[in-house]
Amino acid sequence: MERYAGALEEVADGARQQERHYQLLSALQSLVKELPSSFQQRLSYTTLSDLALALLDGTVFEIVQGLLEIQHLTEKSLYNQRLRLQNEHRVLRQALRQKHQEAQQACRPHNLPVLQAAQQRELEAVEHRIREEQRAMDQKIVLELDRKVADQQSTLEKAGVAGFYVTTNPQELMLQMNLLELIRKLQQRGCWAGKAALGLGGPWQLPAAQCDQKGSPVPP
């Protein structure tokens, strides 16, 4: 009897999983229509079906949420680093300008041309240093963001999310960005399993546009 009950429960679980997969797939198909036609053509039924399968238990939603939080923290940190560097350069320029003004005021007129020439060389050297430091900072930012993108790609690939692998191909990157946007929109609309609802505790549900007035799924 227990074996029979267990078998029934497995069948019921399978049916629930199939229904959940259908609902996620329908929601994805609806969202894809909002993308440019060039990307719609690349997101085949198989790709969307595989993506829906990966999203079934809600784990990928949690992974994406974590990756986005890390990305935002990284971007904020890099922005603050560049802002600090800009402030340092502003202070440096102000101090140099003040130093030059004071030196010119104390300089005898016949020595002024020599002093100004020396100050110009010093100013050019400082500006060169500033440009090099800004260039190095920008390179650091680009490399750090590239590393984060690669980490995201690798993490989502390991999680079995369709379309994700480590690449620098611009077209593939844009496709992956669109896939992330689809996942994010599903997340915002509440399309996740109740057990893994990112701490919100609500039941798994479809977006309002995918349900009739009684809350039943509407076929695509």
UniProtKB/Swiss-Prot annotation:
Alphabetical list of Pfam families matching this protein: DGCR6
Tissue specificity comment: Found in all tissues examined with highest expression in liver, heart and skeletal muscle. Lower levels in pancreas and placenta. Weak expression in brain.
Organism of provenance: Homo sapiens
Residue ranges that the Swiss-Prot or TrEMBL entry lists as coiled coil: 76-142
Main location, first listed in the record: nucleus
Protein name: Protein DGCR6
Subcellular location(s) of the protein: Nucleus
Family statement: Belongs to the gonadal family.
Superkingdom: Eukaryota
Keyword annotations: Coiled coil, Nucleus, Phosphoprotein
Induction note: Increased levels in several tumor cell lines, including lung and colon adenocarcinomas and mammary carcinomas. Strongly induced in Burkitt's lymphoma and lymphocytes transformed by EBV.
